[in-house]
Amino acid sequence: MRSLAILATSLALTAAVVSAKCDPTKWSPPVDGQYNTTGRIDPNKLNVHLIAHSHDDPGWLMGVDQYYMEKVQYILDTAVEELVRNPDRQFMFVEQSFFQRWWHQQGSEVRGIVKQLVKEGRLDLTVNGGWCMHDEATPHYIAMVDQTAYGHQLLMDEFGISPRIGWQIDPFGHSATQGSLLSQGVGFDALYFARIDYQDYGQRIKTKDLEFIWRPSKSRGKESQVFTGEIVDTYCPPGKFEYGNIGNEIQDDADLHDYDVCGEVDQFVKTAQSRGAVSKGSHIFIPMGCDFQYDNSLRWFKNMDKLIHYVNQDDRLNVLYSNLSYYTDMKRAEG
């Protein structure tokens, strides 16, 4: 009897501590296990576009085949499964050297599902689209054009699509050739990258010029210009929002001692607001992915579902699953 009393007291104290830290009644729970991830633009708030992606170098610390066998095939397998689970979810995949290998190993059922996801824009293959994400310093421009054209031709043959967004997030430094010939020149509406000189980056932070119109060719002038964006910090998520890491999960079970939806929401809101403060307009994007992430796509999407569900109840931000084409359209519409 005494042990039952001690247990009851312990549970009461735990509930009191949790309640004092974060009141669970403040938040609407998921309905029938489903989180509200419906995405729409709110003109009166900062709109945060979550871009789910995996950066997959065809050869880095391991060889191409090792990466495919140990990581990439599972990234694509599980990403497709999770997109099917929730029609609001989106995922971007870039490196055609990996995608085409995976594609040719799929049966008719999976191919049909993938074609539908691509048609809906939820499996986004319209970003970069080259065989790899080429370096911009050492390759000859012909090699850059060839590998880009090869990837684009495969996408046109299989899906009838042409990439419209440049995504050069890992090359160190960016050339006029990329900006002119391989961005505007191939029909890209925008180019995004993540590695520029730290002094340039610092100045653009101060002046809110991380996104700008780049005219890489003086002789061609406006004909060569392309909307360009430098990513804040890195192409990986900020802080604990990298859900591929164990321990970063959102704990929203109010019966457990580490329940802290309030803290998760507040940290994300402050992070997004700090990025909004160095950007122009009412739209920012946060890349949700990193090197060879999403081999367990459920971990990522389940936590992003929770993030969207709870942050949008907070009323300080509007968060949605998105893709770079949609984000670019929203930025261009703002002028």
Question: What do these predicted regions represent?
Answer:
Residues 19-335:
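Catalytic-domain carbohydrate-binding cleft regions of carbohydrate-active enzymes
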Residues 2-20:
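Cleavable N-terminal signal peptides of Sec/SRP-targeted secreted and luminal proteins
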